[in-house]
Amino acid sequence: MDAFTENLNKLAELAIRVGLNLEEGQEIVATAPIEAVDFVRLLAEKAYENGASLFTVLYGDNLIARKRLALVPEAHLDRAPAWLYEGMAKAFHEGAARLAVSGNDPKALEGLPPERVGRAQQAQSRAYRPTLSAITEFVTNWTIVPFAHPGWAKAVFPGLPEEEAVQRLWQAIFQATRVDQEDPVAAWEAHNRVLHAKVAFLNEKRFHALHFQGPGTDLTVGLAEGHLWQGGATPTKKGRLCNPNLPTEEVFTAPHRERVEGVVRASRPLALSGQLVEGLWARFEGGVAVEVGAEKGEEVLKKLLDTDEGARRLGEVALVPADNPIAKTGLVFFDTLFDENAASHIAFGQAYAENLEGRPSGEEFRRRGGNESMVHVDWMIGSEEVDVDGLLEDGTRVPLMRRGRWVI
């Protein structure tokens, strides 16, 4: 077995054993781009070797998506397969694990009318709501694992031939997910201990807010009442640990939906609905992004923020050190799974119930500051030029990050 095949097998094994922490006899519902079919077959093999009872996969095809967006009447863009997502949510509530294979061409829908892309995305977000709720409430174990899609590889390495670009991207994936180490499972156990130590410190401090300061950024993010920090291996509602993101470098919590003030500028591009949003900035008042703009992709961004009332509020704030393995590559990945783990970030939209004590829902969730929305979109605001302080209720400042690096 050559080194590449060995690492690919390690990644698939890691996704099942560490990412999902698969339970004996558990079903898996997987989603993936059609280009990842060979990798998905390997994942299915590892799943069955580790006790899965059924592996069901749903593929997405960007070429079909482009045809639809280009050809169907405008009114048809309001259609999305709600029946499919209701079925997925039902499977998760009944105990199936969720496995998402990420990795898409970030420019797959480039050149299409932004208003049509945005309209279809709104419909998709509405239909997807039951599935998103099941995921954010951690009703089951879930994970996201990357695949080196050729279109993604060309976006990251535009100057290389496609085959070489794909090889380079796989190398970056193996490094970021620690599968290039002799014992990836042990490496992840050690990594989780580091993340859990940060989580314990932040939860003990009970900060009232966080303050981000850097070029174009002066942002205060109030934290929800009874907020909890999470990071690394996370328990489901039933208490089973899983690692939701492979890779992950973040610790994150829930902002208070009404206590975000100031201005903030993105430090990395955002891949959104098959288009790139660059130079993103926002100004918040009373928790709402009252002004937003971007140098590129502004229309599709604003369409997303019009999805519902909660789309202009924050559902997540995450701290990520600027000297972690992903950031050290010096690459912009044009992929949220990677870029969010290279920089501190915030997210428009839905908050995670796991980030509030007792995992409340409904009115109690809202009363404590949890945000509700049909969308959840992370965007990166941290860098080596950004400092972060924790603010106690009495106004005391506690330095957390200086020049993007932990000081705790």
Swiss-Prot record:
Gene3D superfamilies listed in its UniProt record: Thermophilic metalloprotease (M29)
Name of protein: Aminopeptidase T
Disulfide topology: none
Species: Thermus aquaticus
Family according to the record: Belongs to the peptidase M29 family.
Cofactor: Co(2+); Zn(2+); Mg(2+)
Self-association and partners: Homodimer.
Cofactor note: Binds 2 divalent metal cations per subunit. Can use cobalt, zinc, and possibly also magnesium ions.
GO biological process: proteolysis
PANTHER family listed in its UniProt record: AMINOPEPTIDASE, AMINOPEPTIDASE AMPS
Chain positions recorded as a divalent metal cation 1 binding sites: 250, 316, 340, 345
Superkingdom of origin: Bacteria
